[in-house]
A protein has these predicted regions:
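N-terminal Rossmann NAD(P)H-binding glycine-rich loop of SDR-like oxidoreductase domains
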Residues: 22-43
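N-terminal Rossmann-fold cofactor-binding loop
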Residues: 50-54, 75
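NAD(P)H-binding glycine-rich loop region in Rossmannoid oxidoreductase-like domains
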Residues: 64, 68-114, 122
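Active-site Tyr-X1-5-Lys
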Residues: 160-186
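NAD(P)-dependent short-chain dehydrogenase/reductase
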Residues: 182-224
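Substrate-positioning beta->alpha
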Residues: 118, 170, 201-202, 218-239, ...
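Conserved Rossmann-fold NAD(P)-dependent oxidoreductase catalytic core, especially the SDR/UDP-sugar
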Residues: 114-163
Length: 354
């Protein structure tokens, strides 16, 4: 069910752009979560964020981070969640583990599914007015044939779904349950998120591979979006009146080869020039699996990453642009150029290492 909540603007429960709101965020030290925090702080909102360690993202200014009320806790600890959410108006649930490694699978399900259930339950307990869940296009499921995915796509169990996708699908079920129990809010499904961050983690590793002139490419197709666009869409939807809806957040669809070439241009590096076929991928992930078994080192390529690299899926962003008519995505060329410049600056200053 999808609906719009109509509220009188004088209602104190109504969110108004420009008015300070108290927003609680999970995953605030992560790539996407930290940019959401920056967006909220710069718009004048009061932010409280839960974290497991004192380490903060180096790619967000200390001026922004110092304006956040940091609370030690964990999404797997319902007591700390309940305490941290007291007095807040809204919740952005961004905490999640993104992994395609067999070794991290159990923890990923634990955090992504049970953690989301805890956040939803705490939000209901604390009578949170608005709830926004950061999901992923992966939660919509991979397609067997080349096609464009919209918000109407129904989840289907098939061999193309990764365990990460399954965990995000099950986490969404807890959010829909929360909506049925009275929470108001939306789910967003970003595609692969690009930007300046820690290139030893998450999708930022794509930039490190390009900088190191990784020579292989595949002919897979996927959706991509800048991290600042994800943050802006998050904040606009958080303070909208839409509820019980999902929105795909995707700027452009392009091949992995095109993406790698654009990033290589940003670093003035060589293009990848060797095609990794499906057969080669099948052999490579098996060799990596054996190496992982015998050495204990995390596999650089898994069965799931090999599968994703060759899939051809595009994502439709029409629903978001209809809902937010003044919203505009930054072109990927601009996103990548800006990110590459910042990565080079971080390397030269010693903030970032290879």
């Amino acid at each position: 069910m999808q609906k719009e909540i109509n509220k009188d603007s004088s209602d104190p429960g109504t969110f108004i752009q420009g008015r300070e709101n108290k927003v609680f965020i999970t995953g605030g030290t992560g790539f996407v979560g930290s940019y959401i925090i920056r967006n909220l702080v710069e718009k004048g909102h009061s932010v409280r964020a839960i974290r497991r360690s004192n380490k903060l993202p180096f790619y967000i200014s200390s001026e922004v981070l110092n304006r956040v009320e940091w609370v030690n806790g964990d999404v797997l600890d319902i007591v700390s969640l309940n305490d941290a959410m007291q007095g807040m108006d809204a919740v952005v649930h961004s905490a999640a583990i993104v992994s395609f490694s067999r070794k991290e699978r159990h923890e990923m399900y634990h955090v992504n599914v049970e953690g989301t259930a805890n956040v939803v339950n705490a939000a209901i307990e604390n009578k949170i007015k608005r709830f926004l869940h950061i999901s992923s296009v992966a939660a919509l499921g991979r397609t067997i044939k080349t096609e464009t995915v919209t918000e109407q796509k129904k989840w289907e169990e098939n061999k193309n779904n990764t365990h990460y996708a399954i965990s995000k699908h099950h986490s969404e079920l807890h959010v829909w349950r929360g909506f049925a129990e009275g929470l108001e809010g939306v789910i967003i499904n970003p595609s692969t998120v690009l930007g300046f961050g820690d290139w030893h983690q998450s999708s930022c590793a794509i930039f490190k591979n390009a900088y190191k002139e990784f020579s292989w490419y595949t002919k897979g197709i996927n959706g991509f979006v800048g991290v600042e666009d994800v943050a802006e869409a998050t904040v606009q939807l958080l303070f909208s009146h839409m509820t019980q809806r999902r929105y795909i957040i995707n700027a452009e669809n392009r091949s992995f080869q095109q993406l790698f070439n654009t990033i290589a241009d940003g670093f003035h590096k060589k293009y990848p020039h060797r095609e990794a076929t499906k057969t080669m991928g099948e052999i490579a992930w098996r060799m990596e699996r054996l190496k992982e078994i015998f050495t204990g080192k995390k596999a650089l390529l898994t069965k799931e990453t090999a599968k994703v690299a060759h899939s051809k899926t595009s994502f439709d962003n029409a629903a978001l642009l209809k809902e937010l008519p003044n919203f505009q995505f930054n072109p990927l060329e601009k996103v990548i150029k800006t990110a590459c410049e910042k990565y080079l600056q971080a390397l030269n200053s010693g903030i970032l290492s290879l």
